[in-house]
Amino acid sequence: MRVTYQTLTLTLGSYHYDIALVLRDALFVNSIMSNSEVWHNVQLKHTQAFEKSDQILLKSIVNAHAKTATEAFYLELAVLPLNYRLSVRRFMYLWHILHRDGDELIRKIYEAQKCLSVRGDWTELVEAEKAKYGISESDSEIAEMSREKFKSKIQKKIEAHAVRCLNNIAENHSKSEQIVDYDFKRKAYFTDRRFSKTDVQLLFALRTKMLDCKTNFQNQYAEDLSCRFCKDNGNIEDEDHILRCTVLNNEKYDVKFSDVYGNIDQQYKAVQVYKTVMRRRKVYLEIIQKSS
């Protein structure tokens, strides 16, 4: 993908994620959704196809593991799944139609579809989405609204619905339950200039429970979750134990795994410690692999 290539080859420093998401919108979303507001007979399988591509792109932007929970990208980055973006476009096209003169062809087609609609018609999609998002305004009321007022109203309702759905998924997913957040804003670590590109990637992996430790990939390690380094069966290899493992560490750190869900200062401190430990851990893993 052009977006991935450009963000990987450009030296963007601490602005990497800001620019990557701008490029996502400009080069990917606007391209793949060109004229999508007029699509009719749109089914779930159609939106899933381009959402899958978007999810691959988001994973590449944060260099995430392939099995990372999908909802995590949207909640951490505060970006909407593309089917909700499509809904916004469709409603704005409705506003456009309702502001045309009654004798214009586009308005005549709309009025005819309303009177003689069949399954899959564009007007049917609009009515279904009005009910879905709780948009009660009639055509005449929409026609009286300014573009800015109508867009602001529908964006708020669609975003609120999307956030509820994403958090409902996260609440029932063990890897995402800690990042449930109804305040739909990009997490501060993506924009805090203290965090390097790799710091952000490490913190994202920690917060989504995709760090390379046995408890995060239990199917891979069957029933043996003991630490690969200290070999103590009483020590399960999880994010907390990595900080305390006597083989990996010769000092005690004043951080704990839960700090990755704390405030931005706690997150920064935790990432610096994890970065040091994971660097040392990588060396030990290479030694183990060579000797096995």
Residue ranges and their predicted role:
Residues L21, F50-E51, A66, L75, ...:
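Active-site-proximal structural scaffolding
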